[in-house]
Amino acid sequence: MEHPVFKRDPSEKSETERREVPPLLKLALELGPLLVFFFANARGEMLIERFPILGSIGAPIFLATALFMAATVIALAISWSMTRTLPIMPLVSGIVVLVFGALTLWLHNDTFIKMKPTIVNTLFGGILLGGLFFGKSLLGYVFDSAFRLDAEGWRKLTLRWALFFIFLAIVNEIVWRNFSTDTWVSFKVWGIMPITIVFTLLQMPLIQKHSLTDEENTAS
């Protein structure tokens, strides 16, 4: 029996199907923790001066990590309270944030939080490629997709996203290993998101080409 976090009870489908997070709020829930992370790292010293108790956490990157973890939990809680479900991608990402964030604070080593994007993107890329290897296009489960594509469309889109996730993992490794912490934080917030938006928009022709009509979807 599947846990309700991942799948709604069929008997409640008609009642809960309409429970959706408004697009702007969904964007805020996704970007909010990242913005908190960026602000806390950039203004960490100011926050510590104003609230001395925060100094016990450590340098700005550690304060940013702690607030990032808290903001992630709050975002997931808001999403759950509104929909009674948690999309698989934010859920897995949130779990990794908490695990690697805790290691960062416990060991006082920011390497762990810097590796978090690498781990998450490699995980999703590997899952998608593994699914394709076994003849399964798992992208719809990862993104909780609302659109419907034919089999060829799902295969192509899944492969593209798998390679994109791997690309993001490689880029993250290059940036955090070769640049300052401040540069890495800025790129994580202001670089990855625009790149992802552009990539997503570039997939629209493929999605439109392989989209199923209501009649085709019913027949399939």
From Swiss-Prot:
GO terms for cellular component: plasma membrane. InterPro entries: YciB (IPR006008). Disulfide bonds: none annotated. The chain crosses the membrane at residues 20-40, 57-77, 86-106, 123-143, 156-176, 187-207. It is found in: Cell inner membrane. Keywords: Cell inner membrane, Cell membrane, Membrane, Transmembrane, Transmembrane helix. It is a multi-pass membrane protein. Signal peptide: none annotated. Plays a role in cell envelope biogenesis, maintenance of cell envelope integrity and membrane homeostasis. Belongs to the YciB family. HAMAP family: YciB. This is Inner membrane-spanning protein YciB. It comes from Brucella melitensis biotype 2 (strain ATCC 23457). The gene is yciB.
